[in-house]
Amino acid sequence: MLANVIEGFAMLDERSRAAELYPLALELISTGAVSLWTSARLTQTVAGIAAAAAHNWEAAEDHFQTALNQAESFPSLLEQAEIRRFHAMMLIDRATPGDRKTARTLLSEALETYTQIGMPRHIEMTQNLLD
C-alpha cells in the first residue's frame, strides 16, 4: 500500500506528502523486499519517487538507477518504462543543465515501450511530459 500512496501523491502533485514517506520507503528497502506483489512495483522505484519528491536528487538518481538495473535483469518492460518516466519527471523538476535533454531521452524510451505494450493513458501522460 505504501507504494500506491507514494505514487499517488506524486501523480497528484502532492509531492510534499510523498516526500514525508521517504523514510518509510527506505525502511521497506531495508527489509530486503525488492518487488511488491500488490503492484509489481520495485521498492527502489518507490524510494526514487519519494526521494525526488523530497528534492533529494542524488538519492533519487541512485534509487532509479538501481531500480532500472533490477527491472532490466528480471526483465520487466513495464517497470523499465515506469522508472524512465518517473526519473524523467525528477529531472524536469530538478532542471539543472542537461536534465531536460536526458529527460526527453528517457521519456522517448518509455513512450516506445508504452506503445509496444498498448497503454494509451501512459502514452498520453508521457507525450504531455514531452511537450
List each language-model region with its residue ranges.
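Helix-coil-helix junctions within alpha-helical repeat/solenoid scaffolds
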Residues: 1-131
